[in-house]
């Protein structure tokens, strides 16, 4: 846990018994937001939002249905959006690399276009005095930061450009399941001042609050 400001429960890829039971409300005590990095059943997300008492923000993974096929009730999509609520400014991109033609799979070129759209919205918000996101949320990792060499689990180079341009304190992703020796060393990587965390399963984190958030506490907006 980082000695910072806003307590967040981040989840991804694996349904965990500790979060899918009567003890969730006490386990998530003090959590101000839940962030899902994808590939979780909608009913699981709906359970977590109900019993944690915190808003849930999500992106879709390569095993999630396409956007037109529905969405988890009560949850807020981050895909290509910036959502600000209290001490959080969240930006997100759904999907993994294209490998089988399924939903939420993108080539590097396609993800670059999606990242450009998101980056333009971030810049527009910054010009309006709303500051940049303190958390980026994706399903796939950035290229070379916690990814693997196979086509499915290779990260996106477009994400590196987002890190270099916007310098978020924290980048959360899932997709790459953690197992085998050295798991702890593979969960957290970094690029510059950005800490990149693979939240596969779950992680409780404390997120740095952006300077502009203190003036808009309790508000919620999206671009």
Predicted regions and their residues:
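Short, structured coil segments at secondary-structure junctions
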Residues: 51-52, 72-73, 192-194
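N-terminal active-site segment of His-dependent metallophosphoesterases
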Residues: 1-51, 128-132
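A short, gly/pro- and small-residue-rich
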Residues: 52-63, 156-159
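Active-site environment of divalent metal-dependent phosphoester hydrolases
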Residues: 15-19, 40-46, 62-69, 98-102, ...
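Conserved catalytic scaffold of divalent metal-dependent phosphoesterases
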Residues: 10-18, 60-154
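Binuclear metal-dependent phosphoesterase catalytic core
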Residues: 1-5, 22, 82-86, 162-165, ...
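Active-site neighborhood of phospho(di)ester-bond hydrolases with catalytic His/Asp-centered motifs
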Residues: 10-12, 33-39, 57-62, 78, ...
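A generic local structural motif
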Residues: 19-25, 42-46, 76-78, 120-124, ...
């Amino acid at each position: 846990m980082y000695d910072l400001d806003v307590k967040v429960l981040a989840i991804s890829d694996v349904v965990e018994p500790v979060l899918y039971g009567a003890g969730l409300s006490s386990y998530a005590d003090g959590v101000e937001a839940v962030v899902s990095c994808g590939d979780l059943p909608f009913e699981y997300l709906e359970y977590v939002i109900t019993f944690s008492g915190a808003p849930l923000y999500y992106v879709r993974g390569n095993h999630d249905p396409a956007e037109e096929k529905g969405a988890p009730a009560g949850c807020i999509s981050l895909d290509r959006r910036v959502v600000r609520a209290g001490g959080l400014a969240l930006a997100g991109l759904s999907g993994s690399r294209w490998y089988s033609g399924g939903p939420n799979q993108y080539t590097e070129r396609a993800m670059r276009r999606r990242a450009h759209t998101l980056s333009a919205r971030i810049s527009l918000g910054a010009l309006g005095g709303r500051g940049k996101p303190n958390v980026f949320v994706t399903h796939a990792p950035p290229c070379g930061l916690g990814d693997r060499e196979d086509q499915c689990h290779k990260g996106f180079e477009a994400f590196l450009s987002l890190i270099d341009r916007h310098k978020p304190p924290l980048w959360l992703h899932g997709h790459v399941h953690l197992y085998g020796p050295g798991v702890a060393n593979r969960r957290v990587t970094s690029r510059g001042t950005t800490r990149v965390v693979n939240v596969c399963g779950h992680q409780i984190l404390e997120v740095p609050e952006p300077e502009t958030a203190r003036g808009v506490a309790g508000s919620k907006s999206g671009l």
